[in-house]
Amino acid sequence: MLDFSTVMTIVMQFALLLSMLSTMNTQATERPAVPDAIKAPAGESVIVNVHASGSQIYVCQASADGKFAWTLKAPDADLSDDQGNVVGHHSAGPAWKYRDGSEVTGKAAARVDAPTPDSIPWLLVSATGHTGEGMFSHITSIQRINTKGGQPPAASTCDTAKLNSESKSSYTADYYFFAPKN
């Protein structure tokens, strides 16, 4: 007969196992077809891919020469798995945080124009930092592809009257996260 403590330990271990398995439902094994300029390094493989839906947030600012322009402040998007479950969030940094608490930040390494002019560019991002242990702990590269929307407002709408105002531009994209092959 098992005592209560042993039963609870088994239950907790089973719950942890189920939690770990549930994070695997977004796992991908194949690299997406992308232009050479934004291909992840050959020694990396896809760990997970997610769909982003949210906004690119722009702010109207004046440059040193007095010209006004909309500049990117931050993305703000939910990350979903292939079943539509929210599994993380994309925010300023840029940063991507997974539901297990792990987070990766990065810096754009390469870009290509999106196939449609009203969409933000496709990117290859190099990881610059990590926090927490989990899905994003060992990510080294991130691709942003299949973008739709997200471009800033027309430049003519940024002027003295709009200085420091924000504008959100809806967008969707697919993000592929890469880590070194085992």
Q: Predicted regions span which residues?
A:
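Primary mode marks residue(s) on the alpha4-beta5-alpha5 output face of response regulator receiver
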Residues: 29-56, 64-182
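Bacterial N-terminal signal peptides
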Residues: 11-22
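Bacterial N-terminal signal peptides that target proteins for export
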Residues: 2-12
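Sec/Tat signal peptide C-region and signal peptidase I cleavage site
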Residues: 24-28
